Amino acid sequence: MVICFTCDYELVRNHLALLILIMNLYQQSINQLNRRSFLNGVSVGVGSLALTSLLGPQGLTKEDSPLVSRGAVNPLHFAPRAKRIIHLCMAGGPSHLETLDYKPKLAEMNGKPMPKSITDGQPIAQLQNNKQLKCLGPQHEFEKYGKSGQLISKALPQIGSIADDICIIKSMTTQQINHDPAHTFMNTGSQISGRPSMGSWVLYGLGKGSDNLPGYVVLSSSGGGQDQPIASRQWHSGFLPSRYQGVHFHSTGDPVLYISNPNGVNQKGQGEVISAINAINKIRNKTVVDPEIDTRISQYEMAFRMQTSVPELIDTSKEPKHMFDLYGAKPGDGSFASNCLLARRLAERGTRFIQLYHRGWDHHGGVKNGVLTTAKHVDKASAALVKDLKDRGMLEDTLVIWGGEFGRTPMAQGSGRDHHIKGFSFWMAGGGIKGGMSYGNTDDFGYNAVEDVVTVHDFHATILKLLGIQHDKFTYKFQGLDFRLTGVCLLYTSDAADEGLGVDLGGRRII
């Protein structure tokens, strides 16, 4: 956020100069830090090393080295395949059975009872009181796309056109069956609210790619179905310093409130006031060593720079008409298509983690028309983003992720499907991912993931590996525990998480 001042600048400068003088005199009277300040400094630990990532490049004496990082992980554990992530979050839980996971057996069983051997003792959300669970066959036909012949729903023809660039993961699983906790688990790797989001972890580990824009940006859109709310804690930094939390850009109007100066305030005067305030903050921080003061300093500086960088970012007047046609976007309409175009522009300018939420996939009823309607909002733009990045030579170091917080049941819920956590689908492209292939499988009904099962922790470990980070070496100490995105170090993660999905599983690799 940007703080604007409308008072007399000469008066403000005089008062601030006096405050700085007083604090300097106070500082000189302190011969040593007291015990509390010392302990505060110790408790910051490794985290404090990353706090200066917004104030300028750190340790970039070998900028040509692929292992150099501006964040807490420096040097990186591996040579990175990806430099940035664009996460296209299909909020609401898209049905894998109408999009990415073809199940002819389920079509044959349409209207017949689901075998109890599959569902007994399983979490089935709102269907648990039904006396008889009946199969609901796929409501859309599938077709082979590309040279790879990947089977993708006809509801997603444009995503089908990039079949040779994407890897479809058909064996995702999660642990939470309701929307908000499922988003929390997918974003943080924990069922407990208040943990850092994966975007915050990535920004903490790698640092910012630009000094003029936030390192973690969130955009949202809706259309096609029931709009489930998305809580802002999904992009929160948790116990990491708050400078690593995501910045939510508004899809219409000014993306950030107060980005423009009010009448009577100019950039030069505002810059002088911010510099004076930050000088006071820096003096204070020498005494208390508080990471949140560093955050405040960086936020003031970032807000000031964003007054120039953000208007340039959202000014799409120089984008050619064929680019709007490619995405199906209209300037300023706040659509998923416009957000995808903005995501590419953010990626070009160095934003590390870009997260786009599209709400509208919660099809408890009318799944056939619902999927088709929602798909029309996202299909063209999702494919356009991959094509655009590829044409610009950016796809090779940009990881694009597409998927929701869970899938949908193969059993009918009226004319729709209920929430499902035992097996669903994602796709990934770029950033070192092998395209034109699928990974894992569910059973014949699309109920249980049975081949190369992927947990959320496996998923996170793979993302980190592509970024050059070994997940079990990437920790942050909080309340005496070494936390990581893939869980507290003492907790179990599956064997696949040790190396991410790149480990040999069934003789196949996706990275």
Residue ranges with predicted function:
Residues Y9, H15, S37, P410, ...:
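Small/flexible residues
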Residues V2-N34:
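N-terminal secretory signal peptides
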Residues E10, L21, I280, G500-L501:
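Short intrinsically disordered, low-complexity segments
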Residues H15-A17, V386, L505-G506, I511:
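Extended rod-forming repeat segments used as scaffolds/tethers
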Residues L11-V12, Q28, G59, E63-D64, ...:
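Intrinsic disorder/low-complexity segments enriched in polar/small residues
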Residues Y492-I511:
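Single conserved hydrophobic/aromatic residue that forms the stacking wall/gate
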